[in-house]
Amino acid sequence: ITEAGCNNRTAFIDNPAGINQTGYKILPEYLKTNFFDIIILAIGINDLQRFFNPTLNEFEQGMEKLIQITKNLSPKSKIILICPSKLNLAGINNGIFSYQFDKISVEKSGKLSPIYKSLAEKYKCHFIDLNNIVEVSSLDGLHFSPKSHKTIAENLYKNLKQTI
């Protein structure tokens, strides 16, 4: 198991913080040096930050690019694509992430499920939609509570058993 999560990492937008914060740039480094039976792509919400502001079409193209990189560099790996839960506007507005996310970010986050589902079908990825499982915490509008993390883990475990 290689855990490659990173705070504030974007999936497909060039992050001003550099290569380690930009998913499509750092992903090949992991894929070229490791063999993975299963790759979990649970990324994308940071691309909706107000100063990046991609259209939904750009979002879809960016996530597709990430899947294509994964398929090209690790063709035998199975992919689980995880759609993030919709952001919580009240939590965003009242929390520490209001400088990064806004009402438009929240609205777009609520429209990601069909994009992820369509890409999962197109590229034959397993698909988990967190919107059907948990909501983000109202404390910051972005992250999950410990209870929600447990629920996500249990659902991911079930999916992994089916995938293997």
Where are these regions (language model features)?
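Active-site segments of SGNH/GDSL-like serine hydrolases
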Residues: A42-L48, I69-V106
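Alpha-helical elements of Rossmann-like donor-binding domains used by nucleotide-donor carbohydrate transfer enzymes
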Residues: K25-I26, E58, K65, I115, ...
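Short acidic/His/Gly/Ser-rich catalytic and metal-binding motifs that mark active-site loops
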Residues: T10-A11, L48-R50, N88-N93, E135-S138
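Histidine-centered active-site loop/cap adjacent to the catalytic His
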Residues: I1, D140-I164
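Short coil-to-beta-strand
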Residues: T33-A42, K78-C83, Y123-I128
